[in-house]
Amino acid sequence: MSGGPIEFRCLECGECCRRLLIDSRLIRKGLPLFPDECGLFPRELIRPGVGIGQPGEPGFRVISYQMTEMVCPHLDEGSCGIWETRPTVCRSYPYMPVVTQGGYVTKEASLECTSLMMEAARRHGVFKIDEGSLEGELRALEKLSGITVEAVENLDEAWSYDLRGGRWVRFERLRP
């Protein structure tokens, strides 16, 4: 490994905006959105994301939504057309919240990020990110993690919406 922690720098390649659908275990998920962020995208591209309660029953509430497309409609020649108002998940990148086997929510850096992949190759796969260069991203990640934390805290009532099957799947079935 060469040097100390790296300072994350976005290369504005747009790759993170071209791989928005994730096939994980039993479902396909899209770009997660808070309810107040749904207006950033055309209505026909939005589906539920995570819900608490029993789908179809009174009291069921959707706590997040998701965008259904692989490529962001706001991507314009490698840059974001809504940079100033982009969704929280975009603000948190390259970090994403993940649930560990013990049920804890932690952060994980995406090695699909071109900038991080280049640094990993240069440093033979071992490096640490200078999180001081990612203050805004970490604040956004904390907000985004709230959805996952609420789902884990309500595991017996939490559901994720599968874009492939168009159905709700129990959140607990998706845990590692």
What is each stretch, according to the model?
Residues M1-P176:
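Short loop/turn segments that flank or connect secondary-structure elements
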